[in-house]
């Protein structure tokens, strides 16, 4: 059911979800670890590594995968999922700055999200997070297997949304479950708060924004990437995607009923999840700048009275315009990519409502938006080497 997929893919998180996944692995491992820690050895996929290199950890004003691991072990709560670092404090940070030297990071060739953490103390604890930032797939204490759920990329909850078409998703949005709409309201409130915090922060990218839409989106993304200790409602595993697909709808100033605005936000969220099911959760393509913008374009078009054809044209044209905007790691600069996507969503929605769209055959744009999405999937998979090569430059001036 779309309701189940929605609740599985829309969750609050403190901080960028890649270092948070690392912190979650050590926080869970701490429950089983005995005695003083000798070392923490972590193996990651390239995308998780890429997104954790230079993004600030919430509440710390600094960054580092090793630090995230130490914070998770020392003061993380493994029962809080993506909110694992919600309660960190200055004392914990001081201890973690010393402990991070015990953490060793290495890479593997996995193409999906993969965090394999081994904590060596008086005993040895292995924690594997796989497929999703909060999916604890494996727990092994010494040689005793506590949990072992075999991961298959095609069996994740996000894959199930492929059983629906965009028309079916739009139909559901017209008559959604009541608890889903209530949760959308919560998502709007949560993401507005961090955006408003960013707007009132000197030096935030939103300070020079030229309209309200990009001001709110850039403010939220910049605040989150800067390590502000505030929750963000994530969409398909990403807080930036959550901000970029929710805020352009949330701040709409036109005269519309609140329920209509909530439904439009829901459509934006579901379209984002739908496209991410094809591209993958962690990819070489910028989710906040391109995929979420397609969701926002759909939501804005629906909000302004657009029909199914116009909504799908808005999605089609956004993907045709923004595909190729790459992900070179999580950082403050993501705010500028989100700005680019928001501008495009606004423009494309206006064009769609006037029945103006990119002709099929122009670049990757197909006549049927579902075919365009499949082309985006194929092309995303064709640039996998980007993730390896870009690591040569991240963090280096």
Swiss-Prot record:
<dbReference type="InterPro" id="IPR005130">
    <property type="entry name" value="Ser_deHydtase-like_asu"/>
</dbReference>
<dbReference type="Pfam" id="PF03313">
    <property type="entry name" value="SDH_alpha"/>
</dbReference>
<comment type="similarity">
    <text>Belongs to the UPF0597 family.</text>
</comment>
<dbReference type="GO" id="GO:0019450">
    <property type="term" value="P:L-cysteine catabolic process to pyruvate"/>
</dbReference>
<dbReference type="InterPro" id="IPR021144">
    <property type="entry name" value="UPF0597"/>
</dbReference>
<dbReference type="GO" id="GO:0080146">
    <property type="term" value="F:L-cysteine desulfhydrase activity"/>
</dbReference>
<protein>
    <recommendedName>
        <fullName>UPF0597 protein Tmel_1007</fullName>
    </recommendedName>
</protein>
